[in-house]
Amino acid sequence: MKAALFVGGWQGHAPMDFADWYKALLEANGFQVDVYETLEPLERPEDLADLDLITPIWSSARSGHREEFGNMTKAQEDGLLKLIGNGCGLAGWHGHMGDAFRDRPTYHFLIGGQFVAHPPGWPDNLQPDDDYVDYDVTICQPDNPLVRGIRSFRIRSEQYYMLTDPSNNVLATTTFSGDHLWWIEGTVIPVTWTRRWDKGRVFYCSIGHELDDLKLPQVTEMIRRGAIWAANGKRAA
């Protein structure tokens, strides 16, 4: 199987460190992996038609942030939509996929959600050290092959508050305490989900601010299974 990683955006999320780890994970599972530090190849989807999987590792790319973060053009978005619609899989995590390309609403329709906050921090919080909380991740479909055998777990990281598509197939959730924003107490937000985009399969997990988050065994296994599942969409069609 062939995968392409598109790596860039905010360096605070250390995109290349994540790309190196993820590339090794995919290669250990039989993938041939190409890494691009530009989105320009998406403008020529016909050249990428043999891909089985795309993963964006490109966070905080929007016009309100610095120009060097990069952004996605309409032509690049159209190319991505065409590739996924034709059966290529899409898989990713955290802000690298869920807080990217905010100027492209159809991109967020594609992935099924959008990051909006991580209480007590906000998207523009100037004290990021205040953003970490201990929170539970609850596996809500224990018989689903993507999470079978993975137990619910606790993690200390950014707890992503997401706006999500109700058509998502939710595999794991988290519940907000209200300790920092009282009015969201008890709110259940998806953490991991799958969805379809025409012939393509989409997988997302909101965990992953630090690379060590993805190295947690439960998270590594969800990412591994999710990527393989997404990449097999063409074969299942």
Feature map (PLM): residue ranges:
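Helical hinge/lid and interdomain linker segments adjacent to catalytic or ligand-binding clefts
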Residues: 2-5, 15-92, 96-99
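Extracellular ligand-binding/catalytic regions of CAZymes and related secreted enzymes
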Residues: 28, 179-189, 196-237
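A glycine-rich, often tryptophan-bearing local segment used as a flexible ligand/cofactor-contacting loop or short
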Residues: 61-148
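Stable alpha-helical elements in mature extracytoplasmic
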Residues: 18, 22, 76, 103, ...
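Catalytic beta-strand/loop cores that center a nucleophilic Ser/Cys/Thr
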Residues: 26-27, 50, 121-198
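Residue-level signal for short, function-critical loop segments
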Residues: 7-10, 96, 208
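Oxidoreductase and adenylate-handling cofactor-binding alpha/beta cores
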Residues: 107-113, 152-169, 208, 220-233
